[in-house]
């Protein structure tokens, strides 16, 4: 099972991940969000991260030219879409960049899961909403037809129980491994350990 730690904001966060060894490191690259980082900070984080930990750039309804600043310079190895991007946008994105694409879906009903199942993205992420720290109704996941990353409301304390009931392809956490708005090394290590042991 893959583990993504999202919302890195400092090179210190990358140093924590270098010892905790998750599978992916995520950065919010669209401006205007609490965890958004500049291109310069993103480059510094990428340079600090161990080469074998891919960096995921999270974008919200961004023009292709903006994504190119990160995709064409090696700052990111994966593109994650967290807005209202449609199938046409996704096809154009995949033609423009040769990076794998993760598409996030806010799950409030079975209809949202139906849309997610049809996505042409390389991976899909099922979430309660960007960075809310709250879970959606996991009972909706029964019989979901494709592999998915699970996000929203995950923490070191609850992840084992969640994974005892559901077997996602991977898990994605941000606020659940923070203390006072910053990444907490102990929580990150505890989360990774709990997932690896589940």
Task: Give residue ranges: language-model regions.
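Conserved N-terminal beta1-alpha1 strand-loop-helix module at the mouth
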Residues: 1-126, 130-198
């Amino acid at each position: 099972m893959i583990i993504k730690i999202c919302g890195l904001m400092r090179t210190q966060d990358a140093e924590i991940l270098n010892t905790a060894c998750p599978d992916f490191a995520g950065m919010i690259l669209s401006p205007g969000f609490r965890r958004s980082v500049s291109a310069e900070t993103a480059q510094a984080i990428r340079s600090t991260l161990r080469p074998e930990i891919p960096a995921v750039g999270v974008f919200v309804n961004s023009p292709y030219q903006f994504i190119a600043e990160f995709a064409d310079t090696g700052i990111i190895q994966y593109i994650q879409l967290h807005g209202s991007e449609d199938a046409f946008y996704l096809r154009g994105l995949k033609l423009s960049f040769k990076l794998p694409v993760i598409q996030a879906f806010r799950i409030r009903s079975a209809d949202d899961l139906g849309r997610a199942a049809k996505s042409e993205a390389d991976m899909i992420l099922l979430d309660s909403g960007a960075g809310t720290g709250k879970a959606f109704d996991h009972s909706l996941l029964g019989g979901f037809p494709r592999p998915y990353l699970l996000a929203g409301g995950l923490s070191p304390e609850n992840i084992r129980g969640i994974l005892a009931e559901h077997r996602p392809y991977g898990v994605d956490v941000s606020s659940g491994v923070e203390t006072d708005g910053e990444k907490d090394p102990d929580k990150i290590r505890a989360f990774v350990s709990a997932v690896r042991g589940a």
